[in-house]
Amino acid sequence: MQQSTLLKPVSCYGIGVHSGKRTQLTIEPAKENTGIIFIRTDISSENNYIEASYLNVSGTLLSTTISNDHKVQISTIEHLMAALWGCEIDNAIIKIDGPEVPIMDGSSKLFVFMIECAGKKLQNAPRKYLKILKDIKVIHKDCELYCTPSNHMTVDLTIDFNSKAIGKQNLSFSNQESFTKNIADARTFGFIKDVHDLQSKGLALGASFENAIAINEEDKILNPNGLRYEDEFVRHKLLDLFGDLYTSGTNVVSSIKGYKTSHALNNELLHKIFCDTTSYKFVTASEL
């Protein structure tokens, strides 16, 4: 398997779900072994770029935020990162003229559409895989996430909310190629009762029925068209997991199991993997 990038640049324009600010975002092709790099074009400085790395994750409250050493940051990168992972884009430059990736419809669907419109170009370098060599677990209260050695990527994810609209949902996933059809269009979600508190903290300022599933105090879905899937909630949590894991810089090959995962837990797992050099190795497809 070879690395890949886009054939040509592609752009979108939208609002940030938390900041409420409108930004333009462009995904551009990049050379082999570049990885995913974000550039804040509204900051005229050589310090305006941020590598999409787990090491640069500086915030995990309701979304994933990355920052560089100069305090330049970009938030809510996970849906775009999931689309890049699902479309098998190894190298890309993301240019954005504001502090937050547009939320679009609350899923990865439109980012996948953009990438498919741009087209994909194979490159003259082998794709790298992060092969897990030993059992690794992270736990926070009743939330847990762990990975075990495997020659294939599989995920078993369970969510459990004290809400009749969501409840307990489980989903197993083992085919990266099915991401764009079965996971990418699952939307983010939230509770109406939390909106006032979140907005008082500068969050959810751009949230609407157009970009999130809204659940009221009576546990009713308020969106006029309802859900896209009966289990859309766990599908979206799986989407978030893939986006966060792609900040490893490559494709994780492991059997992964999670219960009530979060952006913080996802990032903690990567830190725990990389802090022990005997727990992983980078391989090519032929070495899996």
Curated annotation (Swiss-Prot):
Disulfide bonds: none annotated. GO terms for molecular function: metal ion binding; UDP-3-O-acyl-N-acetylglucosamine deacetylase activity. This is UDP-3-O-acyl-N-acetylglucosamine deacetylase. It comes from Rickettsia canadensis (strain McKiel). The active site is at H263. Keywords: Hydrolase, Lipid A biosynthesis, Lipid biosynthesis, Lipid metabolism, Metal-binding, Zinc. It catalyses: a UDP-3-O-[(3R)-3-hydroxyacyl]-N-acetyl-alpha-D-glucosamine + H2O = a UDP-3-O-[(3R)-3-hydroxyacyl]-alpha-D-glucosamine + acetate. Catalyzes the hydrolysis of UDP-3-O-myristoyl-N-acetylglucosamine to form UDP-3-O-myristoylglucosamine and acetate, the committed step in lipid A biosynthesis. Gene3D superfamilies: lpxc deacetylase, domain 1, lpxc deacetylase, domain 2. Zn(2+) binds at H79, H236, D240.
